[in-house]
Regions:
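Low-complexity intrinsically disordered segments
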Residues: 29-159
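Short, extreme N-terminal segment that most often corresponds to the first beta-strand
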Residues: 1-22
């Protein structure tokens, strides 16, 4: 079956879940996908965004909010007692974070969609899937961002 992972910020009690981004949750599935969890992690860790070309054009407070924090890519087969409170030492971080931390994946996707190119790419993928997404939460996010079958989308402005 394989080991599933999520990115965990132990400082803030927040997580990123690969499936929220449409990626597989195994380490090599999401770590090599350029437009998903790793891109989200990059904007969360960015210090000084918005000061140069190639930065994410967004004022979203999530950008850079993880800079300097303790981050772990936690697997569901991870060691018990590592990175968790002493009273929870029989759990691993993946399990503990799943139950106690806040998954901010969809909020980060919304921040990424402040960039017209990223938003257009996400829309084109959804359109190619017939405006259907296997993940119900991500489907609702797309309907909120793009409208039913893309009714809110306009011609890209980045071209």
């Amino acid at each position: 079956m394989g080991q599933y992972y999520k990115v965990v910020n132990t400082t803030k009690g927040q997580t990123l879940t690969p499936h929220a981004f449409g990626s597989g949750a195994k380490l090599m599935e999401f770590s090599s996908d350029g437009q998903s969890v790793m891109q989200a992690l990059a904007i969360l860790l960015a210090d000084g965004n918005g000061r140069g070309g190639g930065d994410l054009r967004s004022e979203n407070p999530l950008i850079g909010s993880w800079a300097g924090d303790n981050i772990v890519v936690a697997g569901d087969y991870g060691d018990e007692g590592k990175f968790v409170p002493v009273k929870n030492r029989k759990e691993n971080l993946y399990s503990y974070a799943s139950q106690n931390f806040i998954d901010i994946s969809f909020a980060v996707i919304e921040a990424l969609c402040d960039d017209a190119w990223y938003k257009q790419q996400m829309f084109e993928e959804w359109k190619a899937q017939g405006y259907e997404d296997w993940n119900e939460e991500r489907q609702q996010l797309k309907v909120n961002l793009f409208g039913e079958k893309g009714s809110k989308m306009k011609t890209p402005t980045y071209a």
